Amino acid sequence: MDIKDLHNKFLECSSIVDIDSRSIREGSMFFAIKGDNFDGNEFVEEALNKGAKYAIVDSDSVNIVNRKILRVKDSLGTLQKLATFHRTKTNSIVIALTGSNGKTTTKELIDCVLSSNFKTISTKGNYNNHIGVPLSLLQIEDDTEYSVIELGANNFGEIDFLTKITLPDYGYITNFGKAHLEGFIDIEGVIKAKTELYNWIIENNKTLILNFDDKQQKKFRNHKNISFTSKDDGDYKFELISGKKISVKNRDIKYHSNIYGDYNYSNICAAITIGLHFGIDSIKIKDALNSYELQNNRSQVLNMNGKEIILDAYNANPTSVSNAIESFSRIKNSKAVVLGDMFELGNNSLDEHKKIVKLLSSKNIDSCYFIGEDFFKVKSTNESFYFYRTKKEFYNSSDEILESYVLIKGSRGMKMEEIIENKIK
């Protein structure tokens, strides 16, 4: 089917797309996507019975019993092409961002700032892959002024692929850290993969958003860009105001946030920079930042049983864990760290876990609790360090967290938020 004709049918569906037959919305266009453990083609009848207006299928086993079923060569590829075609038919300014750490937080901050003055859509949750990005683009409506799209990747070429689907007007990389080393091998691989976004932006004469405090990003300063910095060489200069929650100053204006951790400083600066660049009044930006609250176990500050808990269990890699430790160690009161294993590090895993243990040995932390097979394999004899293979071992131990401040962090698969319910409450 011609993509233009398919797009017309998509508009007939009030621009609603579904890929899960369990949650079909009335009048939607259902794409039968194949996954590792499922085949959407098997659920076409269910989707139509639940109210889908059209079903896009790519299996010969599906009988074309009426005009509602449309067969294509590849359902997923067609979804991606439809998203790109739809993006070209809108007037929305599209901002794409990627990076090793802080993508979701930065996306939400940018969305929060832009939404204070414009009609804006953004990637829902972490829908940042080859399926989520097209679904995000298909949210764009005729009156959407700005779209903030998050791009994720585990391997080389994925950012380039997603960028070509997205066709962004602006591109931003939050940072380069030791994430997904299973696919990227080392930090040089991470830089190569993430800069696929910047390379596309440059090739297509679009605009880079650069953090000049990052030496890798500053290498792109001779290309069309808007920039921010803590020095004097960027378009927007920021100063970090010390405190438990991040505040920054630009010129004589102070912007306050509810966000913990110095490592979120550049995320906030990027959002303010974009807001100012697009002409949003500083008072609106201040109000937007002040209203933003982190969710989903990302640098959340919780108070319970006389303790202040920094729950940063959304995900973890060596760079984000190191940054969290550096920031947390500056707290003056008694403090404890509870860390879970970091995943997707490939052959670097034990070495990176050992580096984290060594880093904590040099910090003034009262107690450190390490959970997971990899941390257990590199355990040390430090008397204030405690190692457990599993969370269950930790729960069953007599070890008690007595400190006033507690940092909890680990990879998503470790589900470190469960520590609160089982060991602190």
Report the location of each language-model feature.
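N-terminal leader/targeting and accessory segments in enzymes
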Residues: 1-81, 85, 260, 326-332, ...
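Phosphate-binding loop of NTP-binding sites
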Residues: 4, 77-212, 216-224, 275-276, ...
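Short gly/ser/thr-rich secondary-structure transition/capping motifs
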Residues: 9-17, 77-80, 128-131, 151-156, ...
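Short glycine/threonine-rich catalytic loop with a Thr-x-Gly-x-Asp
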Residues: 17-21, 36, 259-270, 294-299, ...
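Mobile, glycine- and charge-enriched loop segments
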Residues: 21-32, 119-120, 131, 135-147, ...
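Residue-level signal for inorganic ion chemistry
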Residues: 28, 47, 82, 97, ...
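Acidic, Mg2+-coordinating active-site environments of NTP-dependent enzymes
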Residues: 48, 57-66, 172-308, 333, ...
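Peripheral docking tails and interdomain loops at the edges
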Residues: 405-421
